[in-house]
Amino acid sequence: MTLIQKIQQQNNLTQQDINEFIQTLINPDIENEEKASLLSEYTNRPLNQVEVTYLVQAMIQTMYPVQPVYPEAMCVCGTGGDKSNSFNISTTVSFVVAAANVNVLKHGNKSITSASGSSDLLNKMGIAATHVPDVEGRMNETGLAFLNATDTYPVMKHIQPIRKMMDGPTIFNILGPMIHPYKLDYQVVGVFNPDFVKAMAETLYDLKRKRAIVLHGANGMDEATLSGDNLIYEVNQETGVTSYYLNAEDVGLKPAANGTLRGGTPAENLEITLDILTGKDHSSKRDVVVLNAGIALYVSEKADSIKEGVQLAQQLIDDGKAFEQYKKTGGQVYDHIG
């Protein structure tokens, strides 16, 4: 039976099947149309948590048979694919979290489904992506490094064109946040589809994350939002996986519609980020950064609760530490952003 037949029959796939699937997609000698057909069939399958773990392991093995380690490293990222065109929330959050002396290794990409992905924004900031061999030196110096997925996984260049051919998110939106080249201790992942949250949390547990939160934002975003109840799956290597809902009002923040979080071009998003980090912006955009930073500070054990994490995030912005972290990381400040 061929691989595509196995996928179509929706039988459970073995690790060997999954390895074949990944190897087919990254093979430059196979036509993109054939790969797109295979990826489309797989994306339309019901999500299988065991297969997700196999997929993550297969992707990591293509480049990192032995994953590098940096002590107490954390990543904060979203799957993308929510089509909200929000500003770069998780990139902005990274500066706030790193300002609390959390070792943030953010793994990001160029945008596929919005006007400005994290790599597009970093380019505008003047912050270069860190190559894996340089991570340790960069982290020792600044406590924050940005890794570009096309650099950490050059094989992805064979997959990106197929993803662009497809209408909407694929299985790679789910895998992207979990194939971090580093073996992380802490992670926060925002997910565009609530049906995927549990499987991704269980996969992070299988990958031995010390603590993590996988969440789906109220009203369909891949970040925690201010517009209602956010679905949270919390991972703790000692106690397992638990789920609950979190409302921004529970942690002292005002409700706001997701539409108030819209971003734009990389230049517009940079202006939004700088206004937040310098304490100029007190709108819902600041609040959503504070909420997501609060979650990350709780996960990374800098706060005993998300509410305490939110208070710490506010303090880091108000004290100027978040903006100091931005400059320490190499972020440029412009009189006029264009």
Curated annotation (Swiss-Prot):
Mg(2+) 2 binds at D222, E223. 5-phospho-alpha-D-ribose 1-diphosphate binds at residues 78, 81-82, 86, 88-91, 106-114, 118. Anthranilate 2 binds at R163. It holds the Pfam family Glycos_transf_3. Keywords: Amino-acid biosynthesis, Aromatic amino acid biosynthesis, Glycosyltransferase, Magnesium, Metal-binding, Transferase, Tryptophan biosynthesis. Its cofactor is Mg(2+). Pathway: Amino-acid biosynthesis; L-tryptophan biosynthesis; L-tryptophan from chorismate: step 2/5. The keyword Glycosyltransferase applies. GO terms for cellular component: cytosol. GO terms for molecular function: anthranilate phosphoribosyltransferase activity; magnesium ion binding. It is an enzyme of class 2 (transferase). Its EC number is 2.4.2.18. It comes from the Bacteria. GO terms for biological process: L-tryptophan biosynthetic process. Binds 2 magnesium ions per monomer. It catalyses: N-(5-phospho-beta-D-ribosyl)anthranilate + diphosphate = 5-phospho-alpha-D-ribose 1-diphosphate + anthranilate. Mg(2+) 1 binds at S90, E223. Homodimer. NCBIfam families: trpD. Belongs to the anthranilate phosphoribosyltransferase family. Catalyzes the transfer of the phosphoribosyl group of 5-phosphorylribose-1-pyrophosphate (PRPP) to anthranilate to yield N-(5'-phosphoribosyl)-anthranilate (PRA). This is Anthranilate phosphoribosyltransferase. It comes from Staphylococcus carnosus (strain TM300). The lineage of its organism: Bacteria, Bacillati, Bacillota, Bacilli, Bacillales.
